[in-house]
């Protein structure tokens, strides 16, 4: 049996501004920094230790991992960063204010783009300020023009199978600092959540989700360390 902790990055500046962020490399807000440190303090208080950490290649996830691990006294552990743990790409919605977008397109349509499992937002036009094709982080990667939760899962799964799952099988204790949708994809894999149910699974920012796994990597228990900000979980 081993443990896995999922940590959604703390509030980012664009979370604060209520903008669709996706792959844009926005930093944490001051409140988000405090959330990340608090997550690390909760990890320390729970006596959790890690052998390795994982993060996306986006600053808000990397800094969340760093701040949490520093607060937990474990900043020294190795950390692997990979684009496949990035947030879902919001396509043509990237950078837009969510409230203003709902006023323009209708709240129901925007909710479909945000929460449906397999209906994508409009694609991002190439060559604009949020075209990541030339970003060195994605050298050799076919950068998507838009993504759904389903396509996010399809890129997370190979990384999970090839990089993360073998470490868990070896008994390593892991921290994954990532994003609402990439972590939702991992929860779907582990708990076998249905396509219909997974859009309703919420993962709060900066609140460590501890998942105990058996030797077959099936969840046996799961809980948030900050119970006051916990969200409902699939049955373990």
Predicted regions and their residues:
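Short beta-strand segments
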Residues: 55-56, 176-178
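Phosphate/ATP-binding catalytic cores across multiple sugar-kinase/actin-like superfamilies
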Residues: 155-170
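Phosphate-coordination/substrate-recognition cap region in phosphate-metabolizing enzymes
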Residues: 39-129, 188-212, 216-219, 234-236
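Acidic, His/Gly-rich catalytic cores of divalent-metal-dependent hydrolytic chemistry
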Residues: 226-236
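Extreme N-terminal starter segment of soluble prokaryotic enzymes
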Residues: 1-5
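Glycine-rich phosphate/pyrophosphate-binding loop
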Residues: 121-148
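Loop-to-helix element that buttresses phosphate recognition and phosphoryl-transfer chemistry
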Residues: 11-71, 143-158, 200, 208
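GST superfamily/GST-like fold recognition
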Residues: 180-185
């Amino acid at each position: 049996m081993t443990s896995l902790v999922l940590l959604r990055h703390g509030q980012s500046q664009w979370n604060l501004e209520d903008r669709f962020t996706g792959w844009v490399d926005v930093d944490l807000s001051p409140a988000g920094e405090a959330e990340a440190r608090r997550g690390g303090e909760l990890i320390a208080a729970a006596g959790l230790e890690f052998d390795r950490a994982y993060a996306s290649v986006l600053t808000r996830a990397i800094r969340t991992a760093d701040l949490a691990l520093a607060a937990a006294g474990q900043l020294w552990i190795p950390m692997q960063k990979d684009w496949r743990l990035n947030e879902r790409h919001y396509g043509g919605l990237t950078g837009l204010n969510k409230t203003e977008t709902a006023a323009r397109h209708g709240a129901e349509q925007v909710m479909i783009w945000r929460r449906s499992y397999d209906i994508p937002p409009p694609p991002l036009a190439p060559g604009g300020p949020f075209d990541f094709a030339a970003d060195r982080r994605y050298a050799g990667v076919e950068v998507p023009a838009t993504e759904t939760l389903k396509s996010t899962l399809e890129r997370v799964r190979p990384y999970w199978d090839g990089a993360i799952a073998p470490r868990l099988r070896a008994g390593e204790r892991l921290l994954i600092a990532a994003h609402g949708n990439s972590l939702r994809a991992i929860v779907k894999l582990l708990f076998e959540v249905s396509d219909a149910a997974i859009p309703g699974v919420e993962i709060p920012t900066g609140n460590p989700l501890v998942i105990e796994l058996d030797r077959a990597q099936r969840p046996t228990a799961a809980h948030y360390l900050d119970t006051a900000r916990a969200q409902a979980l699939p049955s373990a």
